[in-house]
Amino acid sequence: MPHSPTQRRAIVLVSGGLDSTTTLAIAQAEGFTVNALSFSYGQRHAVELEAARRVTQAFAVERHVIATIDLRQFGGSALTDSIGVPKQRSLETMGAGIPVTYVPARNTVFLSFALAWAEVLEANDVFIGVNALDYSGYPDCRPEYISAFQTMANLATKRGVEGTGVLTIHTPLIALTKGQIIRRGLDLGVDYALTHSCYDPSAEGEACGTCDSCLLRLKGFAENGLEDPVRYVGARSRAAG
């Protein structure tokens, strides 16, 4: 459905994790009517979709769509294949190369879906919570990638060619540390107990505490002198530090 002249709709990619939830909060704070897009892509940590539902309900988004695409058909990642998730890696090691948790072309696939929905809604804005500081070295989280995709998007769409709408991809977290991201979210009232970040959760959905995503999350809470409110394996929660 097209939007009214006074309504600003945005597509926000929402995984259910810490970064995407903060991004959703930022989009709403900037006055956008949010349509949230999540993906069931055969991920090892499918429990994140329950977190995405909790988050989008808490923020009362206009609509939440969970698109289904089975990337297990290709594999090639610890998140979609029978490859072990790296544990207890140092921050230096995380930044030294592209890890096996990288899902080939995932953000390109996700942003393409977001672009298609944005055209239908006549929305000019897409938000994605990529980060190029405290991250695991994924190539599709870099500023130059986002810039290139935005250029492509405006060349590849009816609205872009006709000049009736210019798409902007917003990356409000791209230059923030994990600690800064958490502080921004807390200032906006985000309840991080609703979120899920772990790549290798237990059968009960508890975070492992040792994968890259958990370690970066714990680092962010420690930087704020706070305890992470989610449950970890072997403990009710994980204290800062």
From Swiss-Prot:
SUPFAM superfamilies: Adenine nucleotide alpha hydrolases-like. One of its GO terms (molecular function) is ligase activity, forming carbon-nitrogen bonds. ATP binds at residues 14-24. CDD domains: QueC-like. Its cofactor is Zn(2+). The keyword Ligase applies. Pathway: Purine metabolism; 7-cyano-7-deazaguanine biosynthesis. GO terms for biological process: queuosine biosynthetic process. Disulfide bonds: none annotated. Belongs to the QueC family. NCBIfam families: 7-cyano-7-deazaguanine synthase QueC. This is 7-cyano-7-deazaguanine synthase.
